[in-house]
Amino acid sequence: MRNFKREYRLIAGLTGTMGFEVGAVDATTGRSLRIVFNVERGDSESNNTASINIYNLSPQSLAVLAQDNCVIDLQAGYDGDMATIIQGIVSHIETNRDGADTCTEIDIVDGLVATRDTNVSVSYKGSINGKKIISDAAANMGCSILFSPSCTFPAFKNFSFVGSATKLFHQVCGASNTNYSIQNGVIQVCAANEAITAMAYVLSAETGLIGFPERLYDNASSSNSGNANTTKRKTQKGWKVSFLMNGHIQANDYVALESSLASGTFRVSKIDTKGDSEGTGEDSWTCTAELLEVS
């Protein structure tokens, strides 16, 4: 992987329509529009989010962003190697002056319309597998759905449900010892502590690892029956790592970590991506991830 020459593309518009794209270098100025972004993604049921500041957008581009349910696809990386960091719906937009420039602040939410607007009313007679229930719910949400290799679901008898699709997912996945999240508009359902695929991305100094991994701990409680006081003990659960921008690594992926402090295969539980196309220093175009031990 060559971590050279930062590149990004921001593509915006309503689904199925022509919108706009920025990020390519202007042939006259030799520069692209400046972008600053912070993307937070994880394996929880909460929607992934991003805040994006982009400078000197045209009035036509601003009009596209102002449309209801405008979709943004943010791609970033290096010369010849970009990947989607996040795809989501604009939830807030505001443009202000910043000296001689204009700065447009954009908030986006992954899967906003699907989770906000979809209610389901279902009733299945007899025995129905949980996978069928949530697959039908995903179709109602307009989302594709993926399952990790070891996902299994129990059968539900005479299952009925009325309410939000997200509550249905929570109920069925909770009863199946699986977890769901939305990643770039796709629902991912994973068995406990399992990645969505078996493929692992190598993360080492040669592929962009910055510095050394930092231990992550869970606080676990232990108590003595003869004493009401509760003590805390630290149990290691994984590693926190920083690395140069790599949009190929997403939440629910496996990472093969290669470092003198830690090595092995881990699952990405959370990943924060920060970028400034005109920033200086390697820390202005990076990812920070929490990698959990795979049991």
Which stretches of residues belong to each language-model region?
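Assembly/oligomerization scaffold segments
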Residues: 1-106, 238, 295
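Extracytoplasmic/secreted envelope proteins and their assembly/folding machinery
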Residues: 87, 131-135, 166-170, 236-238, ...
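Glycine-rich, acidic and aromatic/proline-enriched surface loops and short helix-turn segments
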Residues: 130-144
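An acidic/polar, Gly/Ser/Thr-rich interaction patch typically located in mid-to-C-terminal regions
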Residues: 37-61, 65, 193-295
